[in-house]
């Protein structure tokens, strides 16, 4: 665990405020006070000095204005279902800009102190890591074990409204364990003392109501605080279950145990036997329940990866309820199949690309729109959709052919031609200015990913 240092409780400096103002994004909607981020960015040196005094006053006293503890929730319709039903809207919390600035200064100190303490299992909200890391890890585990003729057992756990269910007292205990205490802890807690929210629909604003549980939505501190909270869950589960998960061995001879992969609250439990997976699931559920997190049994799935397709069924239960066994699971947006066939994922990505292309059909086939604008849409929307997670693929000739067919479909739409026109593919590429093929982009991504893996520290995976 990190050591609680003097730097964490030192006065807030002018440089910290300047850096926090600099990284804040402009163009964000202000809260009820009407103060926008641009006001701080354009304020100059004097504004930074006044902000530094104000933030230090709050830091020393351990108290923040009520406006900083208030959230204005604006419901946004999801696009389906009855608009009058709350479950069909997503609430966006608008917070005071100066309060967000203060939170950014605090969480930077906490991150610097605790980043090295969080386990390698967690890739959410961490610098230099992302969904691709976890997707790659899942595929590699399956590939290596299946190559040895061994089965891999997965449980993809769904935590119901995890952010909103975090027990604050448990969170404070976790922060103390990670060396966050004294004035810094009180500063974080000050945002949660009598925190409140209201709902704004159009020009109408509801009465204020108190929020007593969960992390603050829209607060820059919340993602990292949640990481620390979940790392506490991981540690407790690992300490309780002996001989857990999988044993992984490096070429250097170093070995470690892998039982969980996390991206924020997306949790995948893994073991080399059904019995071990049952123990992991049971212990994970127990720890979550003790910390007042609820596992959604209906949305949690289990899967057995095997070379023969896993003809025999597995029975994993949580609180007496049987978790559904699936043949394929969409993990972090990527299809994981029980026989680990990349073909399934490529088909899925092409299907998603077709949906995007269909939505853009009227634009892509518009003869009055310039080719440069069409290329921009293709490069910025279509390509990222199709090649999401391509770094983890091992594409064969059939997958390359499938990608090429989809690509030419897009380019013909951009060029305003069809197969009936019998125009050579190279001519279509020349007309659209798209010389680099999708399969070449996949190869480039794989090579770039290889470099990323080579640059990782020895303790990373």
Model feature map: region roles:
Residues 1-86, 93, 101, 118, ...:
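Surface-exposed loop/turn segments and immediately adjacent short secondary-structure elements
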Residues 1-17, 63, 68-72, 112-165, ...:
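Active-site-proximal segment of RNA-dependent polymerases
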Residues 3-8, 17, 182, 199-219, ...:
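Short linear motifs embedded in intrinsically disordered, charge-biased segments
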Residues 10, 14-22, 50-57, 105-110, ...:
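Inter-domain linker/hinge segments that demarcate the starts of reverse transcriptase
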Residues 21, 77, 110, 142, ...:
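Residues that mediate protein self-association or partner binding, especially
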Residues 27-35, 73, 84-94, 132-176, ...:
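Conserved catalytic palm subdomain of right-hand nucleotidyl-transferase polymerases, strongest
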Residues 56, 104, 108, 162-186:
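Catalytic-core region of right-hand nucleic acid polymerases
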């Amino acid at each position: 665990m990190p050591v609680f240092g003097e730097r964490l409780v030192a006065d807030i400096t002018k440089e910290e405020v300047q850096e926090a103002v600099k990284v804040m994004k402009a163009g964000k909607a202000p809260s009820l006070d009407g103060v926008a981020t641009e006001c701080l960015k354009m304020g100059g040196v004097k504004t930074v000095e006044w902000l530094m005094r104000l933030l230090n006053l709050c830091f020393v006293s351990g108290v923040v204005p009520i406006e900083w503890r208030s959230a204005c929730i604006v419901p946004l319709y999801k696009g389906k279902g009855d608009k009058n039903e709350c479950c069909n809207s997503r609430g966006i919390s608008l917070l005071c800009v100066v309060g967000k600035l203060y939170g950014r200064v605090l969480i930077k100190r906490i991150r610097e102190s605790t980043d090295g303490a969080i386990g390698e299992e967690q890739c959410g909200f961490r610098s230099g890591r992302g969904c691709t890391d976890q997707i790659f890890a899942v595929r590699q585990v399956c590939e290596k074990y299946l190559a040895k003729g061994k089965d891999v057992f997965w449980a993809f756990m769904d935590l119901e409204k995890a952010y909103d269910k975090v027990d604050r007292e448990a969170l404070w205990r976790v922060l103390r364990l990670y060396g966050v205490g004294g004035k810094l802890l009180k500063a974080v807690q000050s945002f949660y003392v009598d925190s409140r929210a209201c709902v704004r629909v159009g020009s109408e604003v509801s009465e204020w109501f108190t929020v007593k549980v969960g992390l603050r939505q829209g607060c820059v501190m919340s993602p990292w605080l949640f990481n620390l909270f979940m790392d506490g869950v991981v540690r407790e589960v690992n300490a309780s279950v002996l001989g857990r998960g999988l044993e992984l061995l490096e070429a250097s001879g170093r070995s470690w145990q892998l039982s969980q992969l996390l991206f924020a609250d997306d949790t995948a439990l893994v073991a080399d036997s059904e019995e071990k997976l049952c123990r992991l699931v049971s212990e994970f559920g127990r720890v979550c329940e003790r910390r007042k997190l609820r596992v959604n049994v209906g949305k949690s799935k289990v899967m057995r990866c095997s070379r023969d397709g896993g003809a025999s069924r597995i029975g994993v239960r949580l609180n007496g309820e049987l978790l559904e066994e699936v043949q394929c699971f969409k993990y972090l947006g990527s299809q994981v199949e029980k026989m680990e066939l990349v073909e399934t994922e490529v088909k899925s990505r092409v299907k998603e690309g077709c949906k995007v292309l269909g939505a853009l059909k009227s634009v892509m086939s518009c003869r009055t729109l310039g080719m440069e604008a069409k290329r921009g849409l293709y490069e910025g929307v279509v390509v990222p959709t199709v090649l999401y997670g391509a770094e983890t693929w091992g594409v064969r000739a059939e997958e390359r052919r499938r990608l090429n067919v989809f690509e030419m479909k897009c380019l013909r739409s951009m060029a305003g031609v069809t197969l009936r026109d019998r125009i050579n593919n190279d001519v279509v590429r020349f007309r659209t200015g798209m010389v680099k093929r999708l399969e070449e982009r996949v190869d480039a991504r794989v090579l770039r990913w290889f470099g990323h893996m080579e640059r990782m520290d020895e303790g990373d995976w």
